């Protein structure tokens, strides 16, 4: 019987099919390499919706379509299957009821109605909030690199250039008209693509969001259409005596847009926006996933190199001699200037030191090793203080080797 019931179990990550839908006219403007923007994709996680095992019981040939109008994010739900188990003792799981708890109730189950919404919203939807930045990428299939932030200065030239696609970022809060309702449509991506992700509380007024869109121009009409790419949410916490600490809580780039540099653009916009705000003391990250931590490291490293940190003689002063004197003052001044959290700042300096390290000089290598171990000891003091001297030495040695290997990996990704 167990073997028979197994046939009625579906992997919820595989049967939940997501799609960002455009009008046929807008879809036809995409080049071959851009078709992934409208292809079906699957979630990374569904346990918040369908349980820890991420299984759905009671169906064969199950197909759950959750489609979104690519800009407005209005939703269409369709549940189909080849067979449904008829059993009173082990009834099939209630699929729509499970999803209903996590999406706004105004979704439609009519494909015709959904296509009408897509068509109407394509012409009327405009991003909510204040535009705070933009950048341009070549259309897929075109050779060359994106124009990066220089695209912001190009103005009308970008709008008239069919070879590039512009991406725009908008800042919004709960007080932005219409954004609360819009957020209820986009927050499902947090559950589906961030492990341990959860919805934010709407009664917490201070939440801030930056939403990233792809902007297209219809060639004949000149109408701009906007297509959701991802977003980041941050929350300000009081920081003594009269400033705030911004905590990055959620960061999502949809799979069709991943590995194209959009995550870095969104992160760097947040970083610059934070630097421009005098009331912000630093940016912290809440339980970052490894992929996001790598993205953060790469961009923070590039930023510090661009700012000339490796050319500053103070970076190399008193390495391996402990935290003291002028080096402490220099580190504090630089960290406060760039508003980077302490542990992250320490790691960044260690990576830059390792990159510049003369690895053929035993004295320099030893000084660097002592420098890193001293930081590791401070960071893990409670655990290490309970060990014997030999155990502590062994633990620090293993941790140091692991840290250095990770630094090599990150530096390789960042600088080649």
UniProtKB/Swiss-Prot annotation:
GO terms for molecular function: histone binding; histone H4 acetyltransferase activity. It is found in: Cytoplasm; Nucleus. This is Histone acetyltransferase type B catalytic subunit. CDD domains: NAT_SF. GO terms for cellular component: chromosome, telomeric region; cytoplasm; nucleus. It catalyses: L-lysyl-[protein] + acetyl-CoA = N(6)-acetyl-L-lysyl-[protein] + CoA + H(+). GO terms for biological process: DNA repair; subtelomeric heterochromatin formation. Its main location: cytoplasm. Pfam families: Acetyltransf_1, HAT1_C_fung, Hat1_N. Keywords: Acyltransferase, Chromatin regulator, Cytoplasm, DNA damage, DNA repair, Nucleus, Transferase. The record marks 207 as: Interaction with histone H4 N-terminus. Catalytic component of the histone acetylase B (HAT-B) complex. Acetylates 'Lys-12' of histone H4 which is required for telomeric silencing. Has intrinsic substrate specificity that modifies lysine in recognition sequence GXGKXG. Involved in DNA double-strand break repair. It comes from the Eukaryota. Component of the HAT-B complex composed of at least HAT1 and HAT2. The HAT-B complex binds to histone H4 tail. Signal peptide: none annotated. Its EC number is 2.3.1.48. The active site is at 286 (proton donor/acceptor). Belongs to the HAT1 family. Acetyl-CoA binds at residues 251-253, 258-264. Residues 52-54, 235-237 are annotated as: Interaction with histone H4 N-terminus.
């Amino acid at each position: 019987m167990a073997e028979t019931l197994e046939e009625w179990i579906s992997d919820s990550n595989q049967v939940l099919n997501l799609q960002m839908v455009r009008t046929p006219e807008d879809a036809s403007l995409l080049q071959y390499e851009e078709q992934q923007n409208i292809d079906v994709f699957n979630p990374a996680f569904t346990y918040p919706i369908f349980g820890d095992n991420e299984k759905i019981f009671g169906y064969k040939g199950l197909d759950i379509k959750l489609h979104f109008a690519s800009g407005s994010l209005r939703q269409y739900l369709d549940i189909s299957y080849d067979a449904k188990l008829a059993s009173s003792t082990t009834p099939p799981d209630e699929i729509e009821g499970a999803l209903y708890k996590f999406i706004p109730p105004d979704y439609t189950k009519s494909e015709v109605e959904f296509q009408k919404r897509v068509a109407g919203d394509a012409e009327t939807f405009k991003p909510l909030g204040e535009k705070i930045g933009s950048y341009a990428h070549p259309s897929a299939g075109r050779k060359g690199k994106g124009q990066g932030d220089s695209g912001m200065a190009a103005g009308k030239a970008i709008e008239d250039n069919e070879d590039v696609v512009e991406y725009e970022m908008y800042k919004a809060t709960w007080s932005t008209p219409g954004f609360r309702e819009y957020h209820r449509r986009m927050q499902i991506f947090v559950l589906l693509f961030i492990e341990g992700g959860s919805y934010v509380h709407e009664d917490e007024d201070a939440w801030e969001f930056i939403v990233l869109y792809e902007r297209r121009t219809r060639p004949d009409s000149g109408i701009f259409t906007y297509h959701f790419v991802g977003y980041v949410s941050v929350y300000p916490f009081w920081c003594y005596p009269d400033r705030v600490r911004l905590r990055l809580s959620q960061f999502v780039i949809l799979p069709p847009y991943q590995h194209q540099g959009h995550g870095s653009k969104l992160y760097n916009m947040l970083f610059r926006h934070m630097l421009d705000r005098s009331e912000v003391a630093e940016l912290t990250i809440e339980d970052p996933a490894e992929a996001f931590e790598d993205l953060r490291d790469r961009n923070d490293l590039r930023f510090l190199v661009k700012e000339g940190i490796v050319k500053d003689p103070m970076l190399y002063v008193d390495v391996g001699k402990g935290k003291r004197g002028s080096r402490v003052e220099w580190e504090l001044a630089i960290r406060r200037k760039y508003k980077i959290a302490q542990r992250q700042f320490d790691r960044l300096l260690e990576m830059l030191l390792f990159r510049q390290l003369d690895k053929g000089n035993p004295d320099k290598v030893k000084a660097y090793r002592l420098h890193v171990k001293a930081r590791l000891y401070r960071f893990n003091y409670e655990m290490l203080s309970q060990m014997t001297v030999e155990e502590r030495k062994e633990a620090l040695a293993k941790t140091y080797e692991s840290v250095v290997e990770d630094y090599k990996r990150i530096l390789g990704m960042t600088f080649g």
